[in-house]
Regions:
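Feature captures the catalytic ectodomains and active-site-proximal regions of enzymes
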Residues: 1-499
Length: 499
Protein backbone atom coordinates (compact mmCIF):
# COMPACT_ATOMS: atom_id res chain seq x y z
CA UNK A 1 0.00 0.00 0.00
CA UNK A 2 1.20 3.52 -0.77
CA UNK A 3 2.22 5.89 2.01
CA UNK A 4 1.55 9.62 1.79
CA UNK A 5 2.76 12.80 3.50
CA UNK A 6 0.51 15.86 3.18
CA UNK A 7 2.63 18.91 4.03
CA UNK A 8 0.77 22.19 4.56
CA UNK A 9 2.74 25.44 4.43
CA UNK A 10 0.35 27.60 6.41
CA UNK A 11 -0.23 31.05 4.86
CA UNK A 12 1.75 30.42 1.66
CA UNK A 13 -0.07 31.91 -1.34
CA UNK A 14 0.76 32.47 -5.00
CA UNK A 15 1.48 35.99 -6.24
CA UNK A 16 3.63 37.19 -9.12
CA UNK A 17 4.20 40.72 -7.82
CA UNK A 18 7.48 41.25 -5.98
CA UNK A 19 6.60 44.25 -3.77
CA UNK A 20 5.97 42.98 -0.25
CA UNK A 21 6.28 39.37 -1.42
CA UNK A 22 8.48 37.56 1.11
CA UNK A 23 8.43 34.41 -1.02
CA UNK A 24 10.10 36.24 -3.89
CA UNK A 25 12.71 37.64 -1.51
CA UNK A 26 13.61 34.33 0.10
CA UNK A 27 16.18 31.80 -1.08
CA UNK A 28 14.17 28.58 -1.37
CA UNK A 29 16.31 26.11 -3.36
CA UNK A 30 14.53 22.95 -2.23
CA UNK A 31 11.02 24.19 -2.90
CA UNK A 32 12.10 25.77 -6.20
CA UNK A 33 13.60 22.50 -7.42
CA UNK A 34 10.57 20.50 -6.35
CA UNK A 35 8.23 22.90 -8.14
CA UNK A 36 10.31 22.74 -11.31
CA UNK A 37 10.68 18.94 -11.29
CA UNK A 38 7.18 17.79 -10.34
CA UNK A 39 3.53 18.44 -11.27
CA UNK A 40 2.13 21.69 -9.85
CA UNK A 41 -1.30 23.31 -10.00
CA UNK A 42 -3.08 26.24 -8.34
CA UNK A 43 -5.99 25.97 -5.93
CA UNK A 44 -8.70 28.40 -4.82
CA UNK A 45 -8.64 28.75 -1.03
CA UNK A 46 -11.05 31.56 -0.14
CA UNK A 47 -14.65 32.70 -0.27
CA UNK A 48 -17.49 30.35 -1.05
CA UNK A 49 -15.13 27.44 -1.73
CA UNK A 50 -14.31 27.30 1.99
CA UNK A 51 -17.80 28.13 3.26
CA UNK A 52 -17.23 31.88 3.64
CA UNK A 53 -18.87 34.86 1.91
CA UNK A 54 -17.68 35.68 -1.59
CA UNK A 55 -14.47 37.71 -1.50
CA UNK A 56 -13.64 36.74 2.09
CA UNK A 57 -10.06 35.54 2.55
CA UNK A 58 -9.61 32.01 3.79
CA UNK A 59 -8.46 31.24 7.31
CA UNK A 60 -6.67 28.27 8.79
CA UNK A 61 -9.77 26.86 10.48
CA UNK A 62 -12.14 27.02 7.52
CA UNK A 63 -9.46 25.86 5.12
CA UNK A 64 -8.24 22.88 7.16
CA UNK A 65 -11.86 21.87 7.57
CA UNK A 66 -12.44 22.14 3.83
CA UNK A 67 -9.32 20.09 3.15
CA UNK A 68 -10.13 17.37 5.70
CA UNK A 69 -13.79 17.10 4.69
CA UNK A 70 -13.15 17.19 0.95
CA UNK A 71 -16.09 19.51 0.52
CA UNK A 72 -17.38 22.98 1.35
CA UNK A 73 -18.66 23.28 4.91
CA UNK A 74 -20.71 26.34 5.84
CA UNK A 75 -18.66 28.39 8.31
CA UNK A 76 -20.05 30.19 11.39
CA UNK A 77 -19.66 33.60 9.73
CA UNK A 78 -21.88 32.59 6.82
CA UNK A 79 -24.35 30.72 9.03
CA UNK A 80 -24.91 33.64 11.41
CA UNK A 81 -25.02 36.17 8.55
CA UNK A 82 -27.84 34.15 7.02
CA UNK A 83 -29.69 33.94 10.34
CA UNK A 84 -29.51 37.73 10.68
CA UNK A 85 -30.68 38.15 7.10
CA UNK A 86 -33.73 35.90 7.52
CA UNK A 87 -34.49 37.50 10.94
CA UNK A 88 -34.43 34.17 12.83
CA UNK A 89 -31.43 35.54 14.75
CA UNK A 90 -33.84 37.77 16.64
CA UNK A 91 -35.84 34.73 17.78
CA UNK A 92 -32.91 32.61 18.95
CA UNK A 93 -33.76 30.92 22.25
CA UNK A 94 -30.27 31.15 23.76
CA UNK A 95 -30.03 34.87 23.07
CA UNK A 96 -33.57 35.54 24.29
CA UNK A 97 -32.99 33.54 27.49
CA UNK A 98 -29.87 35.59 28.24
CA UNK A 99 -31.70 38.85 27.64
CA UNK A 100 -34.66 37.73 29.77
CA UNK A 101 -32.23 36.96 32.59
CA UNK A 102 -30.75 40.46 32.35
CA UNK A 103 -34.16 42.12 32.24
CA UNK A 104 -35.51 40.04 35.12
CA UNK A 105 -32.54 41.13 37.24
CA UNK A 106 -32.61 44.74 36.01
CA UNK A 107 -28.90 44.30 35.32
CA UNK A 108 -26.28 44.79 32.59
CA UNK A 109 -25.60 42.81 29.44
CA UNK A 110 -21.86 42.59 28.75
CA UNK A 111 -20.70 41.88 25.19
CA UNK A 112 -17.15 40.56 24.82
CA UNK A 113 -15.52 40.05 21.45
CA UNK A 114 -12.96 40.96 18.84
CA UNK A 115 -13.64 44.22 17.02
CA UNK A 116 -12.25 43.63 13.55
CA UNK A 117 -12.88 44.09 9.86
CA UNK A 118 -11.28 40.72 9.10
CA UNK A 119 -14.34 38.54 9.78
CA UNK A 120 -12.01 35.75 10.90
CA UNK A 121 -12.94 35.41 14.57
CA UNK A 122 -15.92 37.74 14.73
CA UNK A 123 -18.07 40.08 12.69
CA UNK A 124 -19.08 43.64 13.41
CA UNK A 125 -22.46 42.86 11.89
CA UNK A 126 -22.97 40.23 14.58
CA UNK A 127 -22.06 42.78 17.26
CA UNK A 128 -24.59 45.21 15.89
CA UNK A 129 -27.32 42.58 15.48
CA UNK A 130 -26.86 41.49 19.10
CA UNK A 131 -27.09 45.12 20.22
CA UNK A 132 -30.17 45.67 18.07
CA UNK A 133 -31.80 42.63 19.68
CA UNK A 134 -31.01 44.02 23.14
CA UNK A 135 -32.63 47.31 22.11
CA UNK A 136 -35.73 45.56 20.78
CA UNK A 137 -36.07 43.64 24.04
CA UNK A 138 -35.64 46.83 26.08
CA UNK A 139 -32.38 45.97 27.82
CA UNK A 140 -31.48 49.06 29.85
CA UNK A 141 -27.70 48.67 30.12
CA UNK A 142 -25.16 47.20 27.69
CA UNK A 143 -21.39 47.33 28.18
CA UNK A 144 -18.87 46.47 25.47
CA UNK A 145 -15.54 44.86 26.25
CA UNK A 146 -13.71 45.31 22.96
CA UNK A 147 -10.77 43.12 22.00
CA UNK A 148 -8.72 44.93 19.37
CA UNK A 149 -7.29 43.00 16.43
CA UNK A 150 -4.32 44.22 14.36
CA UNK A 151 -3.65 40.82 12.79
CA UNK A 152 -6.68 40.04 10.66
CA UNK A 153 -7.28 43.76 10.17
CA UNK A 154 -4.82 46.60 9.70
CA UNK A 155 -2.51 47.19 12.70
CA UNK A 156 -3.94 50.61 13.56
CA UNK A 157 -7.51 50.30 12.33
CA UNK A 158 -9.04 49.66 15.74
CA UNK A 159 -9.81 53.26 16.62
CA UNK A 160 -11.86 53.80 13.46
CA UNK A 161 -13.63 50.47 13.88
CA UNK A 162 -14.63 51.43 17.41
CA UNK A 163 -15.68 54.89 16.26
CA UNK A 164 -17.85 53.50 13.45
CA UNK A 165 -19.48 50.98 15.73
CA UNK A 166 -20.16 53.47 18.51
CA UNK A 167 -21.79 55.82 16.00
CA UNK A 168 -24.33 53.06 15.34
CA UNK A 169 -24.68 52.29 19.04
CA UNK A 170 -25.29 55.94 19.82
CA UNK A 171 -28.03 56.06 17.19
CA UNK A 172 -29.72 53.20 19.00
CA UNK A 173 -29.14 55.00 22.28
CA UNK A 174 -27.71 51.91 23.92
CA UNK A 175 -24.25 50.72 24.92
CA UNK A 176 -21.09 52.06 26.52
CA UNK A 177 -17.48 50.92 26.29
CA UNK A 178 -16.28 49.28 29.47
CA UNK A 179 -12.82 48.04 28.54
CA UNK A 180 -10.47 47.79 25.56
CA UNK A 181 -7.78 45.14 25.34
CA UNK A 182 -5.53 43.80 22.58
CA UNK A 183 -5.96 40.23 21.40
CA UNK A 184 -2.41 39.50 22.56
CA UNK A 185 -3.89 39.38 26.07
CA UNK A 186 -7.49 38.27 25.58
CA UNK A 187 -7.07 35.76 22.75
CA UNK A 188 -4.01 33.71 23.60
CA UNK A 189 -4.11 30.05 22.59
CA UNK A 190 -0.75 28.82 23.86
CA UNK A 191 -1.32 28.75 27.64
CA UNK A 192 0.15 32.19 28.30
CA UNK A 193 -2.21 32.72 31.21
CA UNK A 194 -0.21 35.66 32.52
CA UNK A 195 -1.58 37.56 29.53
CA UNK A 196 -5.11 36.23 29.89
CA UNK A 197 -5.15 37.27 33.55
CA UNK A 198 -4.62 40.91 32.59
CA UNK A 199 -7.61 40.83 30.24
CA UNK A 200 -9.73 39.06 32.85
CA UNK A 201 -8.76 41.50 35.61
CA UNK A 202 -9.79 44.45 33.46
CA UNK A 203 -13.21 42.97 32.72
CA UNK A 204 -13.93 41.61 36.20
CA UNK A 205 -12.10 43.97 38.56
CA UNK A 206 -11.59 47.07 36.39
CA UNK A 207 -7.84 46.73 36.91
CA UNK A 208 -5.83 48.32 34.12
CA UNK A 209 -4.87 51.64 32.59
CA UNK A 210 -7.61 54.24 33.09
CA UNK A 211 -8.81 56.55 30.31
CA UNK A 212 -11.63 59.03 30.01
CA UNK A 213 -12.56 57.96 26.47
CA UNK A 214 -11.65 55.31 23.91
CA UNK A 215 -10.12 57.76 21.44
CA UNK A 216 -7.59 58.94 24.01
CA UNK A 217 -6.78 55.32 24.84
CA UNK A 218 -6.14 54.29 21.24
CA UNK A 219 -4.26 57.41 20.19
CA UNK A 220 -1.90 57.21 23.15
CA UNK A 221 -1.08 53.60 22.34
CA UNK A 222 -0.52 54.45 18.66
CA UNK A 223 1.70 57.37 19.65
CA UNK A 224 3.88 54.89 21.55
CA UNK A 225 3.88 52.57 18.51
CA UNK A 226 1.64 50.02 20.20
CA UNK A 227 -0.65 48.53 17.58
CA UNK A 228 -4.13 47.09 18.05
CA UNK A 229 -2.94 43.58 18.82
CA UNK A 230 -0.98 44.78 21.85
CA UNK A 231 -3.29 47.44 23.37
CA UNK A 232 -2.82 47.21 27.13
CA UNK A 233 -5.95 46.24 29.08
CA UNK A 234 -7.61 49.60 29.59
CA UNK A 235 -10.61 50.85 31.52
CA UNK A 236 -12.77 53.32 29.60
CA UNK A 237 -15.74 53.49 31.97
CA UNK A 238 -15.21 53.04 35.70
CA UNK A 239 -17.62 50.63 37.32
CA UNK A 240 -18.15 48.78 34.04
CA UNK A 241 -16.92 45.45 35.37
CA UNK A 242 -19.07 42.33 35.49
CA UNK A 243 -21.18 42.13 38.65
CA UNK A 244 -23.56 39.66 40.22
CA UNK A 245 -26.83 39.19 38.29
CA UNK A 246 -25.29 40.44 35.02
CA UNK A 247 -25.39 38.59 31.71
CA UNK A 248 -22.38 38.01 29.46
CA UNK A 249 -22.39 37.29 25.73
CA UNK A 250 -19.19 36.19 24.00
CA UNK A 251 -19.32 37.20 20.33
CA UNK A 252 -16.32 35.38 18.84
CA UNK A 253 -17.42 32.41 16.77
CA UNK A 254 -14.08 30.61 16.61
CA UNK A 255 -13.20 28.67 19.75
CA UNK A 256 -9.45 28.28 19.89
CA UNK A 257 -8.51 31.88 20.72
CA UNK A 258 -11.34 32.74 23.10
CA UNK A 259 -11.40 29.46 25.02
CA UNK A 260 -8.76 30.41 27.59
CA UNK A 261 -10.56 33.61 28.57
CA UNK A 262 -13.95 31.90 28.70
CA UNK A 263 -12.58 29.09 30.87
CA UNK A 264 -11.56 31.64 33.51
CA UNK A 265 -15.26 32.52 33.84
CA UNK A 266 -16.94 29.15 33.40
CA UNK A 267 -14.58 26.30 34.33
CA UNK A 268 -15.18 25.41 37.99
CA UNK A 269 -11.78 23.68 38.17
CA UNK A 270 -9.88 26.63 36.66
CA UNK A 271 -6.63 27.19 38.58
CA UNK A 272 -4.31 29.13 36.28
CA UNK A 273 -4.85 32.31 38.29
CA UNK A 274 -7.24 33.56 40.96
CA UNK A 275 -10.73 34.19 39.64
CA UNK A 276 -13.94 35.55 41.11
CA UNK A 277 -16.57 32.94 41.88
CA UNK A 278 -19.82 34.49 40.66
CA UNK A 279 -23.01 33.13 42.17
CA UNK A 280 -25.55 34.44 39.69
CA UNK A 281 -24.06 35.52 36.37
CA UNK A 282 -25.46 34.05 33.14
CA UNK A 283 -23.02 33.31 30.30
CA UNK A 284 -23.75 32.55 26.65
CA UNK A 285 -21.90 32.66 23.35
CA UNK A 286 -23.01 33.55 19.86
CA UNK A 287 -21.51 30.30 18.59
CA UNK A 288 -20.71 27.10 20.44
CA UNK A 289 -17.12 27.75 21.54
CA UNK A 290 -17.05 26.22 25.04
CA UNK A 291 -18.78 23.20 26.53
CA UNK A 292 -19.60 25.03 29.76
CA UNK A 293 -21.90 27.65 28.22
CA UNK A 294 -24.77 27.60 25.77
CA UNK A 295 -24.10 28.67 22.20
CA UNK A 296 -26.78 30.37 20.14
CA UNK A 297 -25.53 28.37 17.17
CA UNK A 298 -23.59 25.11 17.15
CA UNK A 299 -21.34 23.00 14.95
CA UNK A 300 -23.03 20.67 12.53
CA UNK A 301 -22.10 17.01 12.78
CA UNK A 302 -19.89 16.33 9.76
CA UNK A 303 -19.70 12.79 8.44
CA UNK A 304 -17.37 11.32 5.85
CA UNK A 305 -14.23 13.17 6.94
CA UNK A 306 -10.89 11.86 5.73
CA UNK A 307 -9.57 11.22 9.22
CA UNK A 308 -12.59 9.14 10.20
CA UNK A 309 -12.49 7.32 6.85
CA UNK A 310 -8.84 6.32 7.31
CA UNK A 311 -9.53 5.26 10.89
CA UNK A 312 -12.35 3.00 9.72
CA UNK A 313 -10.01 1.49 7.13
CA UNK A 314 -7.38 0.82 9.79
CA UNK A 315 -4.79 3.21 8.37
CA UNK A 316 -2.04 4.35 10.72
CA UNK A 317 -2.14 8.17 10.86
CA UNK A 318 0.18 10.82 12.31
CA UNK A 319 -0.85 14.45 12.79
CA UNK A 320 2.07 16.79 13.46
CA UNK A 321 2.15 20.54 14.14
CA UNK A 322 3.38 23.20 16.51
CA UNK A 323 1.10 24.37 19.31
CA UNK A 324 -0.16 27.27 17.18
CA UNK A 325 -1.51 24.99 14.45
CA UNK A 326 -2.13 21.77 16.36
CA UNK A 327 -5.94 22.26 16.49
CA UNK A 328 -5.94 22.68 12.73
CA UNK A 329 -4.38 19.30 11.90
CA UNK A 330 -6.63 17.59 14.44
CA UNK A 331 -9.95 19.19 15.45
CA UNK A 332 -10.54 21.27 12.33
CA UNK A 333 -9.14 18.77 9.82
CA UNK A 334 -11.51 16.22 11.37
CA UNK A 335 -14.54 18.45 10.87
CA UNK A 336 -14.62 19.83 14.46
CA UNK A 337 -14.44 16.36 15.97
CA UNK A 338 -11.88 15.34 18.58
CA UNK A 339 -11.21 12.14 16.69
CA UNK A 340 -9.76 9.26 18.68
CA UNK A 341 -8.54 5.97 17.25
CA UNK A 342 -5.95 3.38 18.22
CA UNK A 343 -4.10 4.01 14.94
CA UNK A 344 -4.23 7.82 15.15
CA UNK A 345 -1.25 9.55 16.75
CA UNK A 346 -1.39 13.29 17.44
CA UNK A 347 2.00 14.90 17.94
CA UNK A 348 2.15 18.42 19.39
CA UNK A 349 5.48 20.21 19.05
CA UNK A 350 5.67 23.16 21.49
CA UNK A 351 5.88 26.58 19.86
CA UNK A 352 8.63 28.85 21.22
CA UNK A 353 7.77 31.09 24.17
CA UNK A 354 8.23 34.52 22.64
CA UNK A 355 6.06 37.63 22.60
CA UNK A 356 6.06 37.77 18.79
CA UNK A 357 7.18 35.16 16.32
CA UNK A 358 9.34 37.59 14.38
CA UNK A 359 11.64 37.29 17.40
CA UNK A 360 12.16 33.64 16.44
CA UNK A 361 10.90 33.21 12.87
CA UNK A 362 12.20 29.65 12.65
CA UNK A 363 9.69 28.85 15.41
CA UNK A 364 9.98 25.10 16.05
CA UNK A 365 10.12 23.96 12.44
CA UNK A 366 13.10 21.76 13.27
CA UNK A 367 11.09 19.97 15.96
CA UNK A 368 8.20 19.46 13.55
CA UNK A 369 10.60 18.07 10.95
CA UNK A 370 12.17 15.68 13.42
CA UNK A 371 8.72 14.36 14.28
CA UNK A 372 7.94 13.80 10.58
CA UNK A 373 11.21 11.95 10.02
CA UNK A 374 10.49 9.75 13.04
CA UNK A 375 6.97 9.07 11.74
CA UNK A 376 8.43 7.82 8.47
CA UNK A 377 10.66 5.46 10.45
CA UNK A 378 7.53 4.21 12.19
CA UNK A 379 5.94 3.46 8.81
CA UNK A 380 2.78 5.55 9.14
CA UNK A 381 0.36 5.22 6.23
CA UNK A 382 -0.65 8.90 6.30
CA UNK A 383 1.29 11.79 7.79
CA UNK A 384 -0.30 15.24 7.98
CA UNK A 385 2.12 18.02 8.90
CA UNK A 386 1.64 21.77 9.18
CA UNK A 387 4.41 24.37 9.16
CA UNK A 388 3.08 27.41 11.02
CA UNK A 389 5.94 29.80 10.19
CA UNK A 390 4.69 31.49 7.00
CA UNK A 391 1.36 32.45 8.55
CA UNK A 392 2.39 33.21 12.11
CA UNK A 393 5.42 35.31 11.20
CA UNK A 394 3.55 37.10 8.39
CA UNK A 395 1.01 38.25 10.98
CA UNK A 396 3.78 40.30 12.60
CA UNK A 397 4.32 42.33 9.42
CA UNK A 398 8.09 41.87 9.67
CA UNK A 399 9.27 41.04 6.14
CA UNK A 400 12.94 40.20 6.95
CA UNK A 401 11.69 37.81 9.63
CA UNK A 402 9.32 36.26 7.09
CA UNK A 403 12.23 35.61 4.75
CA UNK A 404 14.01 33.79 7.57
CA UNK A 405 10.85 31.83 8.36
CA UNK A 406 10.50 30.68 4.76
CA UNK A 407 14.14 29.74 4.45
CA UNK A 408 13.89 27.68 7.64
CA UNK A 409 10.89 25.84 6.20
CA UNK A 410 12.74 25.25 2.94
CA UNK A 411 15.57 23.46 4.75
CA UNK A 412 12.97 21.30 6.50
CA UNK A 413 11.23 20.50 3.23
CA UNK A 414 14.57 19.37 1.82
CA UNK A 415 15.06 16.90 4.67
CA UNK A 416 11.52 15.55 4.38
CA UNK A 417 11.71 15.24 0.59
CA UNK A 418 14.98 13.31 0.76
CA UNK A 419 13.75 10.84 3.36
CA UNK A 420 10.37 10.48 1.66
CA UNK A 421 12.15 9.37 -1.51
CA UNK A 422 14.26 6.88 0.45
CA UNK A 423 11.24 5.48 2.32
CA UNK A 424 8.84 5.34 -0.64
CA UNK A 425 6.49 8.04 0.57
CA UNK A 426 4.47 10.17 -1.81
CA UNK A 427 5.07 13.77 -0.71
CA UNK A 428 2.26 16.24 -1.38
CA UNK A 429 2.92 19.92 -0.63
CA UNK A 430 0.21 22.56 -0.45
CA UNK A 431 -1.10 25.47 1.62
CA UNK A 432 -4.36 26.42 3.29
CA UNK A 433 -4.53 30.13 2.35
CA UNK A 434 -2.39 33.09 1.37
CA UNK A 435 -0.62 35.60 3.63
CA UNK A 436 3.15 35.80 3.40
CA UNK A 437 3.15 36.58 -0.33
CA UNK A 438 1.49 39.98 0.16
CA UNK A 439 2.81 41.96 3.11
CA UNK A 440 3.13 45.50 1.83
CA UNK A 441 0.73 47.63 -0.19
CA UNK A 442 1.73 49.89 -3.08
CA UNK A 443 1.83 52.87 -0.72
CA UNK A 444 4.18 51.04 1.65
CA UNK A 445 1.54 50.18 4.25
CA UNK A 446 2.25 46.97 6.14
CA UNK A 447 -0.30 44.21 5.57
CA UNK A 448 -0.68 41.48 8.19
CA UNK A 449 -3.92 39.91 6.96
CA UNK A 450 -4.70 36.82 4.93
CA UNK A 451 -5.21 37.09 1.18
CA UNK A 452 -7.58 35.64 -1.39
CA UNK A 453 -4.70 34.42 -3.55
CA UNK A 454 -4.56 30.87 -4.81
CA UNK A 455 -2.25 28.33 -3.17
CA UNK A 456 0.08 25.76 -4.74
CA UNK A 457 -0.46 22.02 -4.95
CA UNK A 458 2.56 19.85 -5.71
CA UNK A 459 2.72 16.08 -5.93
CA UNK A 460 6.28 14.76 -5.91
CA UNK A 461 5.78 12.01 -8.46
CA UNK A 462 6.45 12.54 -12.16
CA UNK A 463 4.04 9.76 -13.12
CA UNK A 464 1.07 12.01 -12.43
CA UNK A 465 -0.32 14.84 -14.51
CA UNK A 466 -2.39 17.50 -12.79
CA UNK A 467 -5.20 19.77 -13.86
CA UNK A 468 -4.16 23.41 -14.13
CA UNK A 469 -6.59 24.64 -11.47
CA UNK A 470 -8.78 23.37 -8.67
CA UNK A 471 -9.83 24.14 -5.12
CA UNK A 472 -8.52 22.99 -1.76
CA UNK A 473 -11.53 20.70 -1.38
CA UNK A 474 -9.90 18.65 -4.18
CA UNK A 475 -6.78 17.84 -2.12
CA UNK A 476 -8.11 14.81 -0.25
CA UNK A 477 -9.98 13.35 -3.25
CA UNK A 478 -6.61 13.51 -5.03
CA UNK A 479 -4.89 11.70 -2.15
CA UNK A 480 -7.67 9.10 -2.17
CA UNK A 481 -6.94 8.67 -5.88
CA UNK A 482 -3.25 8.11 -5.14
CA UNK A 483 -4.16 5.50 -2.52
CA UNK A 484 -6.39 3.85 -5.15
CA UNK A 485 -9.30 3.61 -2.72
CA UNK A 486 -12.86 4.84 -3.17
CA UNK A 487 -13.81 8.39 -2.19
CA UNK A 488 -16.25 8.89 0.71
CA UNK A 489 -19.67 9.65 -0.76
CA UNK A 490 -19.92 12.89 1.24
CA UNK A 491 -16.92 14.45 -0.50
CA UNK A 492 -17.76 16.75 -3.41
CA UNK A 493 -14.17 17.60 -4.35
CA UNK A 494 -12.61 15.97 -7.39
CA UNK A 495 -9.22 14.42 -7.99
CA UNK A 496 -6.71 16.81 -9.55
CA UNK A 497 -5.00 13.95 -11.36
CA UNK A 498 -5.60 13.73 -15.10
CA UNK A 499 -6.24 10.13 -16.07
Amino acid sequence: MKKIILLILDGFGIREGENGNAIKMANLPNLAKIMSDYPVCELEASGEVVGLPKGQSGNSEACHMTIGCGRTVEQPLTLINNKIKDKSFFENDVLLDLIDFVNDNNSTLHMIGLISSGNVHSSMEHFYAALALAKIKKVKSVVFHFITDGRDSLPKSGNKLISDFMAKANKLGLGTIGTICGRYYAMDRDNNYDRVKKAYDAIVYNVGNNFTDYNRCMELHYKNDITDEFINPSIITKGSNIKENDGVLFLNYRPERIRELISAFTDESFNMFNVKKFKNVRFASLYSVDNNIDGAYTNEIISGTFGRYLADLGFKQARIAESEKYPHVTYFFDGTEELSDKNLFKILVPSPRVARYDMKPEMNASGVTEAVLDAMDDDFDFILVNYANPDMVAHTGNIPACVRALEACDVCIGHIFEKAQENFYELVITSDHGNIEYMKDADGSVITTHTCNKVPFIICNKEYKLKKNGTIKDIIPTIVDVYEISKPKEMTGDSLIIK
